[in-house]
Regions:
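RNA-contacting regions in translation and RNA-metabolism proteins
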Residues: 1-203
C-alpha cells in the first residue's frame, strides 16, 4: 500500500514527523520501485536531501525495510509542468504540453532518453503518472518534429485550396500563425501587409 511507504519515511525522517516536510503523493510498484513527492514551505530546507539523509542513510533504511525496493524521491511543485518533469526523472524533459481539461499531458523528450523515460515495462512513466495523477503521452523530439511538419502541410494545403493561393503564400500565412480562413478574414489588411514577403497587392 502506498501509505505504508509514507509511514516508513515518517519514522525515518524527523522533518516529516515534525510536519516541516510533507509527503504529497506516493506511487508504488511493490517489491520493485516507488516514487514519492515531498514539499516544504521552509526555503532553508532541501526536502529531497532531508529524505535521502547523510550518505543516503535515511532512504537506505526505508529501502532495507522494503527488501531493496528502489525509491525515487522528487520535489513536489504546484506548477504541474515542473512537478511532472521532476516525476519523470531520471529522464530529461524537453517540452510539456498540458491539456488541463482532460488531466492529460504530452511530454517531449530527447530521442536517446526514450527508454529511460518509459522505463522497464513502462514502469517509470506509469509511476510518474500515478504520482502526478496525470495521463502521460510520451513523444520523442523527432516524433514531435514530424507531427508538426504534417500539421503545417495540412494547414497550408487547406489555405491553398480554400483561398485559391499559391503554396508558398499559404505557407507564409501558416508560419505567421494564420491557420484558418476565419483568422485571416478577421485580420486587418495593415497587419497582413506587414508579413515579410507580402505587399499591398498580394494582401
Amino acid at each position: 500500500h502506498p501509505q505504508f511507504l509514507a509511514k516508513l519515511f515518517f519514522q525515518e525522517v524527523p522533518e516529516i514527523f515534525e510536519g516541516v516536510i510533507e509527503v504529497k503523493s506516493v506511487a508504488r510498484d511493490p517489491g520493485s520501485r516507488a516514487k514519492i513527492s515531498v514539499h516544504t514551505e521552509d526555503s532553508t530546507i532541501d526536502p529531497v536531501g532531508a529524505c535521502v539523509g547523510m550518505r543516503g542513510s535515511r532512504v537506505q533504511a526505508v529501502v532495507n525495510e522494503l527488501q531493496g525496493e528502489k525509491i525515487d524521491i522528487v520535489t513536489w511543485s504546484d506548477n504541474q509542468a515542473t512537478f511532472l518533469a521532476n516525476a519523470l526523472a531520471p529522464a530529461e524533459v524537453s517540452k510539456i504540453f498540458l491539456y488541463e481539461e482532460k488531466n492529460k499531458v504530452e511530454v517531449v523528450i530527447p530521442d536517446e532518453q526514450l527508454s529511460l523515460a518509459i522505463g522497464r515495462k513502462g514502469q517509470n512513466v506509469k509511476l510518474a503518472s500515478n504520482l502526478t495523477n496525470l495521463e502521460i503521452d510520451i513523444l520523442t523530439e523527432e516524433e514531435e518534429s514530424e507531427r508538426r511538419q504534417i500539421e503545417f502541410k495540412e494547414k497550408s494545403s487547406l489555405l491553398t485550396e480554400v483561398l485559391d493561393v499559391e503554396d508558398v503564400i499559404a505557407q507564409l500565412l501558416v508560419t505567421e500563425g494564420y491557420v484558418s480562413v476565419d483568422s485571416i478574414a478577421s485580420e486587418t489588411l495593415e497587419n497582413i501587409e506587414k508579413i515579410e514577403g507580402f505587399d499591398n497587392d498580394l494582401a
